[in-house]
Amino acid sequence: MTTIVCVRKDGKVAIGGDGQATLGNCIEKGTVRKVRRLYKDKVVTGFAGSTADAFILRDLFEKKLELHQGHLVKSAVELAKEWRTERALRRLEAMMIVANDSEFLLVSGSGDVIEPEQDVLAIGSGGNYAKAAALALLRTENNLSAKEIVAEALKIAGDIDIYSNYNHVIEEV
């Protein structure tokens, strides 16, 4: 399990994730990089779920980005279509948040593509904790950037969620 959170503030979008990989009730690795840049460093993605499945989906999404010249929504919708229709892909257990400098989306395990109503998206076992923390920080008077809000939200989720750690990777577009 994991925590991935994405925040948009002041024209910037930041995605961050923890680095813990578990197998059952055991921590297998604490330095998994679940947030990565794609398509000429203009798109960032973060994944939760089965690590192998997430890598497959990330690679497929990257191919869609290349095919559609970096168009985020078109690439996500095409990935979702393939995810729903391709028998082998339907068994993959993962979710992704994908973002560029102007939009971000949740691509769910059932092949849904969801654009958030608010400036926060979060997935994984610690996702609800991170989302609540990020929303609270966005609603209060402060000078925190999107990246700083992501960092704080990940810390709070890590304090609560036993499947998330403090080894964070945060990218901003």
From Swiss-Prot:
It catalyses: ATP-dependent cleavage of peptide bonds with broad specificity. GO terms for molecular function: metal ion binding; threonine-type endopeptidase activity. One of its GO terms (biological process) is proteolysis involved in protein catabolic process. Keywords: Allosteric enzyme, Cytoplasm, Hydrolase, Metal-binding, Protease, Sodium, Threonine protease. Allosterically activated by HslU binding. InterPro entries: ATP-dep_Prtase_HsIV_su, Ntn_hydrolases_N, Proteasome_sua/b, Proteasome_suB-type. The active site is at residue 2. PROSITE patterns: PROTEASOME_BETA_2. It is found in: Cytoplasm. GO terms for cellular component: HslUV protease complex; proteasome core complex. The keyword Cell membrane does not apply. Pfam families: Proteasome. Its EC number is 3.4.25.2. Na(+) binds at residues 158, 161, 164. Its main location: cytoplasm. Disulfide bonds: none annotated. PANTHER family: ATP-DEPENDENT PROTEASE SUBUNIT HSLV, METALLOPROTEASE TLDD. Belongs to the peptidase T1B family. HslV subfamily. Protease subunit of a proteasome-like degradation complex believed to be a general protein degrading machinery. A double ring-shaped homohexamer of HslV is capped on each side by a ring-shaped HslU homohexamer. The assembly of the HslU/HslV complex is dependent on binding of ATP. This is ATP-dependent protease subunit HslV. It comes from Mannheimia haemolytica. The lineage of its organism: Bacteria, Pseudomonadati, Pseudomonadota, Gammaproteobacteria, Pasteurellales.
